[in-house]
Amino acid sequence: MKLSEICINITDGKHGDCSNQFGSGYYFLSAKDIHDRILDYSTVREITKGDFLETHRRTNLEPGDILLTNSGTIGRMAIARDDERTRRTTFQKSVAIIKPNKVLVNSEFLYYYLLSKNSEIVELAGGTTQKNLLLGDLRCFEIPLPPLPEQRAVAEVLSSLDDKIELNRRMNRTLEQLAQAIYKHMFVDNPEREGWGTKRLGEIADVNWGDTNTTKASYVTDGFIAFSAKGPDGYLPYYDFNVTGVVLSAIGANSGMTWLAQGKWSCIKNTIRFWSTSEEVSTEYLVMATFGNEKWPLRGSAQPFISQTDARNMLINVPEKGLAKKFGDLVNPLFSQMDHNTEQNKVLAELRD
């Protein structure tokens, strides 16, 4: 059956803008707020009640509705949960709403089916400079429709995998916050820090560009984790490093963001990678000491970047009494657990999709 035949409505969001009103409790999502299969309210705009009500007449977001990004980055999806914010949320035209007819189709079954066909949905999009998915093409997308009891059974299994993935994500956030708290206690709030010296990063670490000849075009479906200037976002059939290191986004909007890399990994064009070569500090200490793009010397305005020379010359506090090494010993199990959770999520996502 066509998607339009099993849905009450398939449309997009507001064609135009809304007036901001901080604290109103009425939300205006854009495509950037649809990711990791959730509606992300962390940086969402709040708008006036009047603008919300006007747009809500068109979108009428309810629990069980599916949101799909249809412009720019095509195909990111989320299912609206039974949350008090859901009924106070509308969205821009870069987001489409798929409102299932629950007499015919289970919302979660439809969501997971569309998720499994993500590459086909993306291929429907046209445009050269800015990809756009036409609502007409989306409405004609073919959906197999087993009996409702079978739909519910499939959705229940897949939903349990998603729940485990989300649990691992929350655990990783908690572990990261714990590592940051330990770092703050040992190095930021330490009254002895005034007597510590500094060294250039290049004096205590191996600092070099990532593979400038490799881009995302080389990514494969499965393999060894690869870091771009946006973070760990793909796989390569080989690995360049088998060491704990730090990957720095060196060119573009994310310049100054860092990620800890463990196990076997690579980093591609527009990145700088480094790891400790000193007995005084651990790589885990370096990732925390360099965390935050405000700490890095950014050049350029339209296109921010960090030069390799500037990265090597960046000054790093070097604590006394081997504290930076002790910190590595303390937090290494936390980072290892985070890496394990991430790998487990990869396997769970493959089972689900």
What are the residue ranges of the model-derived segments?
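A short glycine-rich beta-alpha junction/loop motif
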Residues: 1, 87-94, 127-155, 265-271, ...
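Low-complexity, Lys/Gly-biased intrinsically disordered segments
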Residues: 1-40, 49-56, 189, 194-239, ...
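Non-catalytic DNA-recognition/assembly elements of restriction-modification systems
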Residues: 1-13, 140-228, 317, 321-353
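A short beta-sheet element
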Residues: 30-31, 50-115, 228-312
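Alpha-helix initiation and N-capping motif
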Residues: 107, 118, 179-180, 198, ...
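Well-ordered mid-protein domain cores that form the structural environment of catalytic cofactors
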Residues: 115-116, 123, 144
